[in-house]
């Protein structure tokens, strides 16, 4: 009998804390989208596009980028050699982004150096939700060129 009383009292206390509004359901984060990768011989080109709101303030500051849901960052790296022993290659990156309505933006790409690493970064503005197609032309030092195209979806955070 005493066991039932303690159980009933415990349930009553637990339920007393349930009187407020139910918490809002969590908004699921959009799934992480993989980087786009292109291999040409022993050269690997990797491109990543993400909303700058996902960057930490420190990273955004280091990249010289304003954080925001509607600002998308394109990060491109050109590497040569076997994985884990790759060296950065200088290149000229030309990039455009096109949304589903056919609106096209040129992305101004700039060099981003960190130690021995060399990447290229640029931003574009978008409306949300949106699907963006990225078209890149990569011209490596020495004149070899290649293209890359990939699509990513972006949602309000």
Where are the model-predicted features located?
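Post-signal-peptide N-terminal segment of Sec-exported extracytoplasmic proteins
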Residues: 33-68
């Amino acid at each position: 009998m005493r066991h039932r009383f303690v159980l009933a009292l415990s349930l009553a206390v637990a339920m007393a804390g349930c009187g407020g509004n139910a918490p809002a359901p969590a908004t699921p984060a959009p799934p992480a989208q993989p980087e786009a990768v292109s291999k040409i011989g022993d050269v690997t080109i990797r491109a990543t596009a993400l909303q700058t709101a996902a960057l930490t303030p420190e990273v955004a500051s280091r990249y010289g980028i304003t954080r925001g849901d509607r600002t998308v960052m394109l990060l491109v790296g050109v590497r040569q050699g076997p994985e884990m022993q790759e060296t950065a290659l200088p290149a000229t990156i030309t990039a455009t982004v096109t949304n589903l309505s056919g609106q096209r933006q040129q992305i101004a790409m700039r060099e981003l150096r960190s130690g021995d690493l060399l990447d290229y970064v640029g931003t574009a503005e978008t409306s949300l939700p949106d699907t963006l197609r990225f078209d890149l032309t990569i011209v490596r030092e020495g004149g070899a060129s290649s293209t890359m195209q990939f699509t990513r979806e972006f949602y309000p955070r």
